[in-house]
Amino acid sequence: MSGLGWMKENWRLLVITAVWIVAATSLAVKGVNLGLELKGGTMVIAKTDHPVSKKEMDQTVTVLESRLSTFGFKGIKIQPVGRDHIIVMLPGTPPKEAVELITKPGRFEAKYKGKTVITGQDIESVESPRIERVEGGYQWSVPFRLTAEGARKFAEVAKNAPGQPIDMYLDNKKVSSPRISEDLAMAAASGHMEREIEIVGGAKTKEQAEREAKEIMAVLRSGQLPAKLVPEGVYSVSATLGQNFLKMAMIAGAIAFAAVSVIIALRYRDIRISGPILFTGSSEVVFLIGLASLTGFTIDLPALAGIILSIGSGVDDLIVITDEIVRGERRKEEVTLRQRIKRAFSVVLASFATLAAAMAVLFVAGMGLLKGFAIMTIAGAFYGVVITRPVYADLLKKILGTE
C-alpha cells in the first residue's frame, strides 16, 4: 500500500495532523490562560455576612463567575469553603480592582421620588456599553432591556411624570438620573410599555469611562449576591515561583522524553522506535494545550500535573504495545500480530478505565481546586487511547516491517 493510501486508511493520523494545525493556530491567535500560580495575580478570601445554604453559596459562585467574566477577567477560580467563606483567584488582576468587583452586592434600584419602581429582578438583558466623547470628557451608557412586568411598572410611573428624573442606584449609590421625555410619557399614557432603558454616566478620561461602564454592565448582568461579602484577606501572588516551575517542568519533560526514547531503543535494540514515541508523546501535549487554548480552560499547577500524569501513563501504554509487537515477533510466538496487539490494547483499555474512574470521582466530589488535574488527566488519557496509541502501533508495524 502506498504511503498516501496508508494515511487515508489510518484516519487517526489525519486527526493528529489536524490537531497540530488547529492547536498552533489557536495558540497564535488566542494564547492560553495561565493560572494564578503561573501568571501571578490576586487571591481574595471573603466571608459572607451570615452563614448561607448550599444553594445560596452555589448562587454566589455563579454570580461572581458571571460578573468577573463579563468584566473581562480570564482564568477565574472560585472555591467555596464551608457555609460562610469563599476563595477567589484572579490571575493578573490588581488587588483593588478585584476586591471592588467581588464585594459589590449588586443591588440595582430605579426610584421615582424616593419610591422603588424597578429592581434588578426586572432586568431581562444587558447590552454592551457605548462610549462617546463629549465636551469636558466622555459619556458612557449601558443599555438594558426590562422584563414585561418591569416595563409595566415603569410605564405606570412614566405616564404621569414627563420631564421628571428617574434615579438609578447601584448598591445605594446613585449612578444615573435620566429624565422621562415628553414622548415617552405620552407613549406610556397611550398604553405603550417601553422596555429599552439605559444608565448614563460620564468620566474625564476614556479609560475611566470604559471601566465604569464595564463595571455597571458586569454587575447588572450577574445580578445581586445572596449575601454581602466582606474581604478577610487580599493577597498579591508573584508569578516568579510558578514561572520557574513551568520552565523546570518543560525541561524535565523534554529530558524525560529523550531518556525514555533512548532506554526503549536500547531495550529493543532499534533506534527507529524512538521516533514514534517522541511523535506520540508530543502529539498528546499539543492536544492538551490546544484544547485549553480553544476552550479557554485555565492551565494551573493541578492542570499541569494532570498533563504530566497523562503523558506518564501514556509512556506505560507505549511500552506495553512495543513489547507485544517487537518482543513477541522475536520470540516467534504462535500468536498472530493482530492477536498480540489486541492483547496489548486490552491492558491499555483496562489502565484507562481505572485511571478515568479515579479521576471522575475526584472531579464529581466537588474538589474544585483539583478539577483541572482530573480534566487534563482524563482528556489526555482518552485522546491517547482513541487516537495516539493506535497510531503508534501502526507506525511501529510499518517501521519494523511486521505488517
Curated annotation (Swiss-Prot):
Involved in protein export. It comes from the Archaea. Part of the protein translocation apparatus. Forms a complex with SecF. Keywords: Cell membrane, Membrane, Protein transport, Translocation, Transmembrane, Transmembrane helix, Transport. One of its GO terms (cellular component) is plasma membrane. The chain crosses the membrane at residues 13-33, 245-265, 285-305, 306-326, 347-367, 368-388. Gene3D superfamilies: 3.30.70.3220, Multidrug efflux transporter AcrB transmembrane domain. NCBIfam families: PRK08343.1-4. It is found in: Cell membrane. GO terms for biological process: intracellular protein transmembrane transport; protein targeting. The keyword Membrane applies. InterPro entries: SecD/SecF_arch_bac (IPR022813), SecD/SecF_CS (IPR022646), SecD_arc (IPR024912), SecD_SecF_C (IPR048634), SecDF_P1_head (IPR054384). It holds the Pfam family SecD_SecF_C. Belongs to the SecD/SecF family. SecD subfamily. SUPFAM superfamilies: Multidrug efflux transporter AcrB transmembrane domain. The keyword Transmembrane helix applies. It is a multi-pass membrane protein. This is Protein-export membrane protein SecD. The gene is secD.
